[in-house]
Regions:
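Structured, active/binding-site neighborhoods that engage oxygen-rich ligands
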Residues: 1-219
Length: 219
C-alpha cells in the first residue's frame, strides 16, 4: 500500500514512473492492489533502507522480499531486491568487498567476475534486475569511495539513474557519503521527504563523512 500512497501523492515526478508502475497506480486507484509480476529494477532501487533497518541476513531477506513483492513479485524482481539489501547490510557491518562479492554470487547466482571497464563499451540499456543489479554491484566493487562508485555506475550507461541509485545505496553503507553531497541531495527533497529521511536516519543511522571523518553512524 505504501508505494501507492507515494505514487498518488507524487503523480508527476521528474522523469516520470516506469510504465508498469504507472499502470499499477491506475489500477490501485480503482482498488486493485495486485502486484504486476515485474522483474523490473525498481524493486532493487528502493530497497536500500531494508539493509539499514534489520540486522540479520534472514530478516533482510524476508523484508526485502516484502518490499519487492508489493509490486515486483517476479522471482527475479525479488532476488534483485534481496541481493541489493544484503549488500547494504554487509557493507554497513564492515565486511570486505570480496566477502560481499562471494556472498552475493553464491547466494543469488549473479556473475560478478567482471569490471566496469570490461563492459562499458558493450553494455546496453536494460530495465530488469538481471541486467542491472549485477552491474550496479560491480560499480560499487570497482569504486574507491562513494563518488567513485557513482561515477562508475553512470559511466556504464543504460538505465544509469537506477544503476547509480542501487550502487549508491551500497556505497553509502560501505564508504559513507561526503557531507556536501548529502546536503545537496537532502536540500532538493520536499518537506515531507525531508521528514521521512530524518526520522528514518534518527532511528536506523546513516554514514555521513565530513572531511573523511564519520559524523553520523549506524545506530
Amino acid at each position: 500500500f505504501a508505494p501507492y500512497l507515494y505514487g498518488a501523492n507524487y503523480p508527476h515526478p521528474l522523469g516520470g514512473y516506469g510504465s508498469g508502475f504507472q499502470k499499477w497506480l491506475w489500477q490501485a486507484e480503482n482498488g486493485n492492489f495486485e502486484p504486476y509480476t515485474s522483474c523490473g529494477n525498481g524493486s532493487a532501487m528502493r530497497v536500500g533502507p531494508v539493509g539499514w533497518a534489520f540486522n540479520t541476513i534472514e530478516d533482510v531477506l524476508e523484508y526485502a522480499k516484502h518490499s519487492a513483492e508489493s509490486t515486483h513479485n517476479h522471482p527475479e524482481g525479488i532476488k534483485g531486491a534481496q541481493a541489493t539489501a544484503i549488500c547494504v547490510l554487509l557493507g554497513r557491518k564492515g565486511f570486505g568487498k570480496e566477502k560481499i562479492r562471494s556472498e552475493i554470487s553464491t547466494r543469488f547466482g549473479y556473475n560478478l567476475n567482471f569490471t566496469c571497464d570490461e563492459i562499458r563499451d558493450t553494455y546496453k540499456w536494460g530495465g530488469i534486475c538481471q541486467d542491472t543489479v549485477p552491474q550496479a554491484i560491480v560499480a560499487f566493487l570497482d569504486g574507491n569511495d562513494f563518488e567513485d562508485c557513482i561515477r562508475n555506475a553512470v559511466s556504464i550507461g543504460g538505465d544509469s539513474d537506477t544503476l547509480a541509485c542501487i550502487t549508491g545505496s551500497i556505497a553509502e553503507a560501505y564508504f559513507g557519503v561526503p557531507e556536501e553531497m548529502y546536503k545537496e541531495a537532502f536540500n532538493r527533497l520536499t518537506p515531507h521527504f525531508k521528514n521521512v529521511v530524518t526520522e528514518f536516519e534518527e532511528k536506523f543511522g546513516n554514514k555521513i563523512l565530513n572531511n573523511g571523518n564519520l559524523t553520523k553512524k549506524d545506530v
